C-alpha cells in the first residue's frame, strides 16, 4: 500500500469521525473459555484458537502460550503496523523488525512477596530498521509511532481495568 492508497482508505473515515465523533468510538472485544481439565484459557482470536496457560516460572510446562508473551506480541504487532502506516504517510522507505521485552518478578503473581509487583515492571520496545532515510526523519517516525500506537499508549497510560463476574 502506498501513501495515496492509505489516504484513500482513511480519508472517508477521518471525515466521518470529524463530522460524527461518536462514530469513532468502538468497543473491541475478546473472550476465552476456561479449561476445566487444566489451568488454561482458550482464546479465540478470530484467526485461530490460542490456548494460554501458566508460564514455566509459575509452574507451567511451557507447552501453552503465556499471557505475558501475548501482551508483548500485541505491542509488537501494534507498533509494527503503526510504524508502517506512519512511514507510508511520510513516504519513507523503511524495513526491519520489532522487538519487545519485559521484566517480571514472579514472586508477585505467586504471592511469595507482597512487596513484589504483580505484572511487568518495565517494557522495552526496539525497532531494528533498515533504511537510508536521514536520522531526523527516523526520529520523527519513532515519535509518531509512539504517539499513535494504541497498545503502547494503553500500557503507558495505565488504563483502569474493571474486574467483574456473573453467575449462570
Regions from the PLM with identified roles:
Residues 1-73, 85-168:
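Extended beta-strand/beta-hairpin segments
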Residues 74-79:
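Alpha-helical metal-binding/catalytic segments enriched in His/Glu/Asp
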Amino acid at each position: 500500500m502506498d501513501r495515496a492508497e492509505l489516504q484513500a482508505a482513511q480519508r472517508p473515515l477521518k471525515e466521518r469521525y470529524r463530522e460524527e465523533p461518536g462514530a469513532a468510538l468502538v468497543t473491541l472485544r475478546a473472550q476465552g473459555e476456561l479449561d476445566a481439565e487444566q489451568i488454561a484459557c482458550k482464546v479465540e482470536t478470530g484467526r485461530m484458537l490460542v490456548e494460554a496457560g501458566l508460564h514455566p516460572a509459575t509452574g507451567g510446562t511451557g507447552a501453552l502460550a503465556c499471557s505475558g508473551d501475548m501482551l508483548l506480541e500485541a505491542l509488537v504487532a501494534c507498533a509494527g503496523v503503526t510504524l508502517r502506516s506512519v512511514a507510508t504517510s511520510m513516504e519513507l522507505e523503511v524495513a526491519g523488525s520489532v522487538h519487545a521485552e519485559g521484566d517480571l518478578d514472579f514472586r508477585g503473581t505467586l504471592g511469595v512477596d507482597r512487596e513484589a509487583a504483580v505484572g511487568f515492571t518495565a517494557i522495552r520496545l526496539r525497532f531494528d530498521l533498515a533504511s537510508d532515510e536521514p536520522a531526523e526523519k527516523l526520529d520523527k517516525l519513532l515519535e509518531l509511532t509512539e504517539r499513535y500506537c494504541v497498545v503502547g499508549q494503553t500500557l503507558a497510560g495505565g488504563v483502569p481495568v474493571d474486574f467483574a463476574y456473573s453467575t449462570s
